[in-house]
Amino acid sequence: VQLQAALAQAPQGKPVTIRGKISAVEKQALKVTTSAGEVSVKLPDDVRIGGVETAQFSDIAAGKYVGTTAVKQADGSLKALEVHIFPESSRGTGEGHRPWDLQPGSTMTNANVEKVEQVAVEKIQGQLLTLKYKDGEQKIFIPPGTPIVRNVPGDRTLLKPGTGVYVAAVRGEDGTVTAIRITAGIGGIMPPM
């Protein structure tokens, strides 16, 4: 019953993602400057807000729950564009492997880290993560310099002009964009997902 009530209250429309920097903050809205221009984003009272802070590869270990955006290489293997480490309380969030919209052909995998190995791919030293989820597994190469962040709790105090954000939202039939979840960069970073 609670799930049905929550779904009934969720904003209706086409899912959209917005990546950019906050240019203005109002009580119930944000203006976000993206590569395509400025977007006005409605902030409902129940919008979920979290942050990301810089992390290191050494923070990733077997048993952690992570998400990674990757692209397929010519040989069919996956190369990470970014990795985000979830807190234990978020284990299971978006679990699985699916298409993603960071760039053409990109994918998102949210899964448990099964194994971490040191490898060389085309003479580039890096790490190979074996990620396991309910219906399968993926092996993803993490080259040096790949952005790695840690998801942390957040609230509206993170939403300030100049802050980099990733916004999961819906666009209504009237064109209004309503945020469902906002991830804000902490310490000047841009959420890499």
Where are these predicted regions, by residue range?
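Short, flexible, surface-exposed loop segments at domain boundaries
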Residues: 1-193
